[in-house]
Amino acid sequence: MTNYIIRRLLLVPVLLVGVTLIIFGMLQLLGPVERSALYVVDFPKNEKQIDAVIKRYGLDDPFFVQYWRWLVGVQRPDTQGNIVRDGGILYGDFGYSRTASQEVIDIIKNRFPNTLDLALWTIFPMLSVGIWMGVKAAVNQNKFFDQAARIYSIIGTSFPTFVFGLLLLMLLYANNQWFLPGKMSDWVSILIYSGEFKQYTHLLSIDALLNLRLDVFWDALRHMIMPIITLSYISWATFVRVTRSSMLETLRMDYVVTARAKGLKESDVINKHARPNAMLPVVTMMGGSIVGLLGGVVITETVFNYPGIGKAAADAAAQLDVVTILGLAIFTGLILIISNLVVDILYAFIDPRVRLS
């Protein structure tokens, strides 16, 4: 098991290099003249200005020279003559966002807790209810619940996210205002910035519980309900379908038939013999569901005006803010690599064949 974890950990730097090479390579599809526009507020009209920018930032240097400079930055003298490091994503310098008028790393610090708060509340129903429905559908094959679950899984995986989000916005907010877009109400914002509300984790819903403020927790939940439903319904439907298929296959295995022949209760056969083994494909799918979740937040946060990483990426894309998009893409890639590492380790704990291989 230890060797397996070590091998997976050693793979992380390789994956990071691959991600950064792909992202930086996509930027290099633009010529030096086009990329020079990223370093000035207005695109320079004078050819001498363009040449000066290209020369200063080495935009016509060989690919790997530019790539290394992008990773570690360069040392330049500041206005006082002191040598300072300019750039370098390995040092946390992802560049300056002209869309948000702040450093990209500050956007990540301010926005990622909001997306994480939303993701945590999305993953719980997605996994628990999706797996429960899949198991129940398999146990009741061809009965009413199974038919309903199969219909839901087909509809859920074929309904566009943004259309579903707009429908929720119209039904639950525009007509009834049961739930609200955005992150919080004005009175919660005033409470937070007054200093009376301690931000332990910077996750609003969690901090509300830690501060014993159920009114703040309910307000946070009212703002997250629609994004949670929108983000989870596709993966939820996928988990239902995969769990059902895996469970049906497991129920036909010899060891399950033997357990029934021994006279074990049906609940013990399902919960102790069939379901644990049926979870292996489900665990494998978790990595892909996280990818889908992070992809879905761009649309979902934009539809519901939720101030997370996805909304920041959408705003940057609308303004052609390439520096911000690259920084957020690298950070998202890092999150995906870590998430898949956790899933691989979890899979090894569940399946002894993996950790013993």
Predicted segments with their positions:
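An internal, D/E-rich "acidic patch" concept
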Residues: L59-I131
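N-terminal signal-anchor/first transmembrane alpha helix
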Residues: M1-P62, I105, N110, L127-S128, ...
